[in-house]
UniProtKB/Swiss-Prot annotation:
<keyword id="KW-0444">Lipid biosynthesis</keyword>
<dbReference type="InterPro" id="IPR008278">
    <property type="entry name" value="4-PPantetheinyl_Trfase_dom"/>
</dbReference>
<keyword id="KW-0276">Fatty acid metabolism</keyword>
<keyword id="KW-0963">Cytoplasm</keyword>
<keyword id="KW-0460">Magnesium</keyword>
<dbReference type="GO" id="GO:0006633">
    <property type="term" value="P:fatty acid biosynthetic process"/>
</dbReference>
<dbReference type="GO" id="GO:0000287">
    <property type="term" value="F:magnesium ion binding"/>
</dbReference>
<keyword id="KW-0443">Lipid metabolism</keyword>
<feature type="binding site">
    <location>
        <position position="8"/>
    </location>
    <ligand>
        <name>Mg(2+)</name>
    </ligand>
</feature>
<dbReference type="GO" id="GO:0019878">
    <property type="term" value="P:lysine biosynthetic process via aminoadipic acid"/>
</dbReference>
<dbReference type="InterPro" id="IPR002582">
    <property type="entry name" value="ACPS"/>
</dbReference>
<dbReference type="Pfam" id="PF01648">
    <property type="entry name" value="ACPS"/>
</dbReference>
<keyword id="KW-0479">Metal-binding</keyword>
<comment type="similarity">
    <text>Belongs to the P-Pant transferase superfamily. AcpS family.</text>
</comment>
<keyword id="KW-0808">Transferase</keyword>
<feature type="binding site">
    <location>
        <position position="60"/>
    </location>
    <ligand>
        <name>Mg(2+)</name>
    </ligand>
</feature>
<keyword id="KW-0275">Fatty acid biosynthesis</keyword>
């Protein structure tokens, strides 16, 4: 049973500008340690910015699907987006008792990154 659908689009240069302006403080506030570490596979700032923009969009899409937004119960850095060995994007949430499965799709082109997520309960 589907319990929520979320979508978000991010302007990649915005993420790059925030990163340049606030540095690691921005990264640590928004992204998990795993996401920051995973960005090291990219050698260019632009590649890293695409990586972070897709994960930013995934976090926003996730809380939209939940219908809660960010707040006391969930912070951006509590959410981790990663890829399986086969490249499929996955999402996990620390300190959460939410028991939904997530189907996540990420994409980027030119200056934009997008995330689409479906949350569902297993029958």
């Amino acid at each position: 049973m589907i319990v929520g659908i979320g979508i978000d689009i991010v302007y990649i240069p915005r993420i790059l500008n925030l990163w340049k302006k606030f540095g690691n403080k921005f990264l640590k506030k928004v992204f998990s340690q795993e996401e920051i570490k995973d960005s090291n596979k990219y050698t260019s700032c632009e590649g890293k910015a695409r990586h972070f923009a897709k994960r930013f969009a995934a976090k926003e899409a996730y809380v939209k699907a939940l219908g809660t937004g960010f707040g006391k119960s969930i912070k951006m850095s509590d959410i981790t987006t990663y890829n399986t060995l086969y490249g499929k994007p996955q999402i996990t949430v620390k300190k959460s008792n939410i028991d939904y499965k997530a189907e996540l799709s990420l994409s980027d082109d030119t200056d934009y990154a997008i995330a689409f997520i479906i949350l569902h309960k297993e029958s």
